[in-house]
Amino acid sequence: MKPPGPMMNELLAIGHPEVMAERRRWLASLAEERRLSEKTVDAYERDTRQFLTFLTGHLAGPPRLSDICALRPADLRGFLAQRRKGGAGARTLGRGLAGLRSFLRYLERNGLANAAGAGAVRSPKQPKSLPKALTDREALKVVTADAQLAEEPWIAARNAAVLTLLYGCGLRIAEALDLTPADFSGPVTSLRVTGKGGKTRIVPMIAAAAEAVETYRKLCPYHIEPEEPIFRGARGAKLQPAIIQREMQKLRAALGLPDSATPHALRHSFATHLLAGGGDLRTIQELLGHASLSTTQVYTGVDSARLLEIYDRAHPRA
């Protein structure tokens, strides 16, 4: 069954028209101004929809802006408690609270609410989970061009280029698919990347990544303007993450890789293998585009046996 679209989501959400109108504007701003990924925006849409439904039951009627303005920390804790009772884990609850804080801050900036109540609620403590990195041998299998399963050469080259950017440069999948010809216009050994929140960083581009992208661009049948995304779907539209995720599923089956071998696992592998090769955390933080060093520090806990296996080698694709 297909997930509900935006119109159905509006019908499912319960709130006064003035609240729903502001919510639509806020969601649009997340994608257009803050450049959050489609996945994050969809998650925030679900979280706020569930919160409005909770408030409707809590207030015995669809909430108005005045009700949102009068929210207390206890109201938010009650919502989180209900979600926890329904089986939501700490990560889901933390993301939900982050979405509500974002919505309330948006309303506060527009003089429509007070976000202090959300700020007074602590985020659930997140369990430490270690990245599931591929071995260097597994990662190389994935990014090798002749391992791609697509019948058309340009699509096989496209898939190989995207996956090589994830592993060879540590990009998020959304960052790779947003790349334009202009992002490659600097030195041949560097790449301009626009990450979360619209923040730009310059990352080194190893030869294998540069060659993979160049091969794709030579084979791609579509004309691409300097400010347009370079990676295209079969019909010429911007390539969507789901296509690369499906390609990775096929590669997993063909190469006998574990279920943990996902596009994002290639980014984890980039960081893990660099750390094992002697890279320092601060540099890896900058390469990954992490706002906080604490986010990067999770790589120090990666299985020591895996690190020892590749200890004396630098990045395998360098």
Swiss-Prot record:
This is Tyrosine recombinase XerC. It is found in: Cytoplasm. Residues 129-312 form the Tyr recombinase domain. Forms a cyclic heterotetrameric complex composed of two molecules of XerC and two molecules of XerD. Residues 17-108 form the Core-binding (CB) domain. It comes from the Bacteria. PANTHER family: PHAGE INTEGRASE-RELATED (PTHR30349), TYROSINE RECOMBINASE XERD (PTHR30349:SF90). Signal peptide: none annotated. InterPro entries: CB, DNA_brk_join_enz, Integrase-like_cat_sf, Integrase_catalytic, Integrase_recombinase_N, Integrase_SAM-like_N, Tyrosine_recombinase_XerC/XerD, Tyrosine_recombinase_XerCD. GO terms for molecular function: DNA binding; tyrosine-based site-specific recombinase activity. Its main location: cytoplasm. PROSITE patterns: CB, TYR_RECOMBINASE. Keywords: Cell cycle, Cell division, Chromosome partition, Cytoplasm, DNA integration, DNA recombination, DNA-binding. GO terms for cellular component: cytoplasm. The active site is at residues 172, 196, 264, 267, 290, 299. GO terms for biological process: cell division; chromosome segregation; DNA transposition. It comes from Rhizobium meliloti (strain 1021).
